[in-house]
């Protein structure tokens, strides 16, 4: 189920802030001390920003297309779209880059709209594999191109700052649809264009 544009209206701002105070007390802090008095409000406002993707439908960004493209039917690639997301298992940050390619089928979309699709899915609780598939499916369903390729690189704080504590590790996922999946040459051209492997820790 897509929870786009849905909010839990039964949970108030005050209740969300009280939940933060509970976590502060659980951690051993005093939420009434001066340095923490505004923390619950700030955390709730930050969450409103970090998870604003639940209030959007990414498909909406791809509704306006352009068909006057003078017969252009070759690969279109947008690479190094930076994103910030949060792991749904530990609520820890995921920071990385998204690379998108598609073969138009008579229409194209403004490149900023592809970046907005990425933002909309990233600003939710995610696992990288799911986000990769969601972005590819959104583009395929809305633009109906001959093929779509999505590659995501991500550094996961749930691995670098807790548990195994392995810094410098990045995860790479891909989703290929249509010609990108069926034709090795198209897939290779896309992967050559995006040059996967730039250190996401430099972001």
Curated annotation (Swiss-Prot):
Q: Which GO MF terms does the UniProt record name?
A: GTP binding; GTP cyclohydrolase I activity; zinc ion binding
Alphabetical keyword list: GTP-binding, Hydrolase, Metal-binding, Nucleotide-binding, One-carbon metabolism, Zinc
**What pathway or pathways are given for this protein in its record?**
Cofactor biosynthesis; 7,8-dihydroneopterin triphosphate biosynthesis; 7,8-dihydroneopterin triphosphate from GTP: step 1/1
Membership in a protein family: Belongs to the GTP cyclohydrolase I family.
Q: Which PANTHER family match?
A: GTP CYCLOHYDROLASE 1 (PTHR11109:SF7), GTP CYCLOHYDROLASE I (PTHR11109)
Record HAMAP family? FolE
From the Swiss-Prot or TrEMBL record, give the protein name: GTP cyclohydrolase 1
